[in-house]
């Protein structure tokens, strides 16, 4: 993109365009413009300003044909008019006029059959760096013939001062115009808006092409056996998919087409609060030159204090995936052999591992369950159930059943085994029982991956009708059936019913969708 290309677009008097700059140029600009500081680890650390996380209430889709008939409108996918979009796009172009701009071209999707060409335009060097880290970097040849399928304009300091007149949530805006293949971001610096914005678009495009898009991590073994790990925040997805005996395909966003599984991204975006080099050596080793730290506290001597959460709990690092030693270079793999749903059940009633039928897999996928521990006024802590459809509802423009149906079809077609793994509590709920030990969970995962779990006999967990193995190598058989781990068996039965009711209540939202009653595969009271 040349300066006169911007002129035609309505972005006037651009001082200079940095078109796909290399890491060294970005590093120099970040320091020169005082956007960040160099740390003793070699990575630059930046602050994302007042927004240290996403702004989901400020995300909108332009409501217009033909996309309006596909989008699941509601609190997550909020509608906005074409007129308001046009007005804010004009403001965005005015705002970017007269500035030095960075244009970053990249791909979302490692599969040649499914990838999309993405362009990001921003005035901020570290945001360009973030895009270079997180998406798939084109070759020189690909850049020569690059034609974007979608362009995202970031105006981080632009506020919409007419938001009340427009009937919007705040002066921040993240708006997707599917028909024009454009998105605009205004008023927030947070890098995750760019990452998850493109993820939302992949979650729109791919299912309409009959391909499944997924919020999961993926790895591959020596026998080319692929495993997918789904789970909400705090369930152990990152930790459990980092396996010394397997190569990482990706840590967060994947597609599944007729050729197999592929990463959407070319990088990782890892949480670093409390990062311990002994517990997570891969992530720690990846934090070096070209990695980009967000919202960490840096001491005067340039050392990073990973324990300090004074800016936010959501401290992060982005880095190109080749910073991880054991990654699969083409970011792809064959159809998965195993799918693992991770739930941190703080009620302490789900088994450490259970095998799911296809119908149960669709049910638990649509439920997207975990339980968080929340503090109450009197200092009593009790679990709070969290349900997020498909383990990533915030990023799904289409109705969750669209993704569940595709998952069911693919499980059937490729004979995939699906398991539910509880990384939460055993022996009682939070406060009475204890957290499932990491070695026990790893042993369950290993038994799934090496196939030995299929040799076990199974018993049935009542109400939930889950198949529980009676033997898993490396796991104390006494903990495999959760009821056995509770001293008060009646209290366990009551808690199991309580959780079943929460599942049933959550699932009422799906009544009357499609021609299949998914609820039959869930708990029955």
Curated annotation (Swiss-Prot):
One of its GO terms (cellular component) is cytosol. Substrate binds at residues 54, 190, 196, 316. One of its GO terms (molecular function) is metal ion binding. The keyword Nucleotide-binding applies. Its main location: cytoplasm. Mn(2+) binds at residues 196, 215, 252. Keywords: ATP-binding, Cytoplasm, Decarboxylase, Gluconeogenesis, Lyase, Manganese, Metal-binding, Nucleotide-binding. Pfam families: PEPCK_ATP. ATP binds at residues 196, 215, 231-239, 280, 316, 441. Involved in the gluconeogenesis. Catalyzes the conversion of oxaloacetate (OAA) to phosphoenolpyruvate (PEP) through direct phosphoryl transfer between the nucleoside triphosphate and OAA. This is Phosphoenolpyruvate carboxykinase (ATP).
